[in-house]
């Protein structure tokens, strides 16, 4: 799965940020991305394990991959629309 994280179109470093900042930054970044591009989010807030997948479901973007077994957490999302 780690290979999926090696070539994102965009990267967002949310290390040290706490809820709701990471999701707010993801939303702002995704808005500027063309459809189909990917965003790698790197975070250490435990709330992101719930918030990032929830954001993807609510906004109908694809959660391509996630690694949350150890810090830092990594999420790869693809903009769907």
Swiss-Prot record:
One GO cellular component term, please give it. cytoplasm
Alphabetized, the UniProt keywords read: Cytoplasm, tRNA processing
Q: List, alphabetically, the Gene3D superfamilies matched.
A: TusA-like domain
Q: List all disulphide bridges recorded for this chain.
A: none
Provide an example Pfam family for this protein.
TusA
Q: Which GO terms describe its biological process?
A: tRNA wobble position uridine thiolation
Gene Ontology molecular function, alphabetical: sulfur carrier activity
Cell location: Cytoplasm
Entry keyword tRNA processing:
yes
Cite the active-site annotation: 19 (cysteine persulfide intermediate)
Q: By its UniProt entry, which InterPro entries does this protein fall under?
A: Sulphur_carrier_TusA (IPR022931), TusA-like (IPR001455), TusA-like_sf (IPR036868)
* Pathway given in the UniProt record: tRNA modification
Give start-end of the signal peptide: none
What does the record give as the function of this protein?
Sulfur carrier protein involved in sulfur trafficking in the cell. Part of a sulfur-relay system required for 2-thiolation during synthesis of 2-thiouridine of the modified wobble base 5-methylaminomethyl-2-thiouridine (mnm(5)s(2)U) in tRNA. Interacts with IscS and stimulates its cysteine desulfurase activity. Accepts an activated sulfur from IscS, which is then transferred to TusD, and thus determines the direction of sulfur flow from IscS to 2-thiouridine formation. Also appears to be involved in sulfur transfer for the biosynthesis of molybdopterin.
Q: Assembly and partners?
A: Interacts with IscS.
Return the similarity comment: Belongs to the sulfur carrier protein TusA family.
Q: What is this protein called?
A: Sulfur carrier protein TusA
């Amino acid at each position: 799965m780690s290979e999926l994280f090696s070539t994102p179109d965009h990267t967002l470093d949310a290390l040290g940020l706490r809820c709701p900042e990471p999701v707010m930054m993801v939303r702002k970044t995704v808005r500027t991305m063309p459809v189909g591009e990917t965003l790698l989010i790197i975070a250490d807030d435990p709330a992101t394990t719930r918030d990032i997948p929830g954001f993807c479901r609510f906004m109908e973007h694809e959660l391509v991959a996630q690694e949350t077994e150890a810090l830092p957490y990594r999420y790869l999302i693809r903009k769907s629309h």
